[in-house]
UniProtKB/Swiss-Prot annotation:
This is Cytochrome b. It comes from Sorex haydeni. Keywords: Electron transport, Heme, Iron, Membrane, Metal-binding, Mitochondrion, Mitochondrion inner membrane, Respiratory chain, Transmembrane, Transmembrane helix, Transport, Ubiquinone. The lineage of its organism: Eukaryota, Metazoa, Chordata, Craniata, Vertebrata. Heme b b562 binds at H83, H182. It comes from the Eukaryota. GO terms for biological process: mitochondrial electron transport, ubiquinol to cytochrome c. Component of the ubiquinol-cytochrome c reductase complex (complex III or cytochrome b-c1 complex) that is part of the mitochondrial respiratory chain. The b-c1 complex mediates electron transfer from ubiquinol to cytochrome c. Contributes to the generation of a proton gradient across the mitochondrial membrane that is then used for ATP synthesis. The cytochrome bc1 complex contains 11 subunits: 3 respiratory subunits (MT-CYB, CYC1 and UQCRFS1), 2 core proteins (UQCRC1 and UQCRC2) and 6 low-molecular weight proteins (UQCRH/QCR6, UQCRB/QCR7, UQCRQ/QCR8, UQCR10/QCR9, UQCR11/QCR10 and a cleavage product of UQCRFS1). This cytochrome bc1 complex then forms a dimer.
């Protein structure tokens, strides 16, 4: 009798995706982040669901409903901090996942890569709207500042902002719609992740060498299932340590003050995972230019496959490109640091130089270096 997992319509899909999937035999732990992102998404949806049961999306009661969750609901504090820090873990995994794709040339799978860029935008939008929901000072002012950026769009800008706000300022209508979108988007993200996986399985995974691995495949189960479980355990270890020992480490103290439209916080800044983009936004003195740079800081990823000039796919055997890649990582860390600093000397000029270097590395230096490496190898 044929195995049920190979004949049952539903089991067949699971089997071909997670059990009998032919996988390269040499993929390293950098390939674990896809499954970790899946786990993060599940954790976020579950904790978010339980938070939504107790949360009220009204400006008068939102802040106190979050306080109520933390104080009165059984393990409410745990659910709330798992959700807040789960977002941080989500972004850590996302950045490492994208970094892996850039380093090993996984962006050559065009459909998979472009859906990945779309997923990154969707997750960033979801996280931004989620940050508004507790209705603290940073929630309110963050929402005001970021939505206001749309007013830089010529002709329709101010109308667009008022349309998003549902009034003439960030108020009850804004909070209610942000809650609705924050609830629905993770399910759209889950669907997109399914499509992401579908396109990946059309081509098969890339591997560290960047070479075709068709001649040397192994089944996903048990080899990579056990490897993924180890990754998940480490993720849970880091997340629970963060939640139980220092849950507010990555948060902003200002968000423990209820939103007050009459009192602006001294330093308005987003969560740590947006600081690099925020630094790029602030480094351009023109409003529209800043908004364009902000969008392009992520959208530039979609251009990367077309700028691949090397004859080799992976950076594994390209030391000059490796140097530039790690300079890019250092540059992003610098931008993250600058995004959290006040707008004053010397932070302004550091931010501007780091922003220029960011685009210069991706759009100019890396493609030129790849051509130089081809030349060295007489290719």
């Amino acid at each position: 009798m044929t195995n049920l997992r190979k004949t049952h319509p539903l089991m067949k899909i699971i089997n071909s995706s997670f059990i009998d999937l032919p996988a390269p035999s040499n993929i390293s732990s950098w390939w674990n982040f896809g499954s970790l992102l899946g786990v993060c998404l599940i954790v976020q949806i579950l904790t978010g669901l339980f938070l939504a049961m107790h949360y009220t999306s009204d400006t008068m009661t939102a802040f106190s409903s979050v306080t109520h969750i933390c104080r009165d609901v059984n393990y409410g504090w745990l659910i709330r901090y798992l959700h807040a820090n789960g977002a941080s873990m989500f972004f850590i995994c996302l950045f490492l996942h994208v970094g892996r794709g850039l380093y090993y040339g996984s962006y050559m799978f065009l459909e998979t890569w472009n859906i990945g860029v779309l997923l990154l935008f969707a997750v960033m939008a979801t996280a931004f709207m989620g940050y508004v929901l507790p209705w603290g000072q940073m929630s309110f002012w963050g929402a005001t500042v970021i939505t206001n950026l749309l007013s830089a769009i010529p002709y329709i800008g101010s109308d667009l902002v008022e349309w998003i706000w549902g009034g003439f300022s960030v108020d009850k209508a804004t909070l209610t719609r942000f809650f609705a979108f924050h609830f629905i988007l993770p399910f759209i993200i889950a669907a997109l992740a399914g499509v992401h996986l579908l396109f990946l399985h059309e081509t098969g995974s890339n591997n560290p060498s960047g070479l075709c691995s068709d001649a040397d495949k192994i089944p996903f189960h048990p080899y990579y299932t056990i490897k993924d479980i180890l990754g998940v355990l480490l993720l849970i270890l880091v997340l629970t340590s963060l939640v139980l020992f220092s849950p507010d480490l990555l948060g902003d103290p200002d968000n423990y003050t209820p939103a007050n439209p009459l009192n602006t916080p001294p330093h308005i800044k987003p969560e740590w995972y947006f600081l690099f983009a925020y630094a790029i936004l602030r480094s351009i003195p023109n409003k529209l230019g800043g908004v364009l740079a902000l969008v392009l800081s992520i959208l530039v990823l979609a251009v990367v496959p077309f700028l691949h000039t090397s004859k080799q796919r992976s950076m594994m055997f390209r030391p000059f490109s490796q140097c530039l890649f790690w300079i890019l990582v250092a540059d992003l860390l610098t931008l993250t640091w600058i995004g959290g600093q006040p707008v004053e000397h010397p932070f302004i000029i550091i931010g501007q130089l780091a922003s220029i270097l960011y685009f210069l590395l991706i759009l100019v230096l890396m493609p030129i270096t790849s051509l130089f490496e081809n030349n060295l190898l007489k290719w």
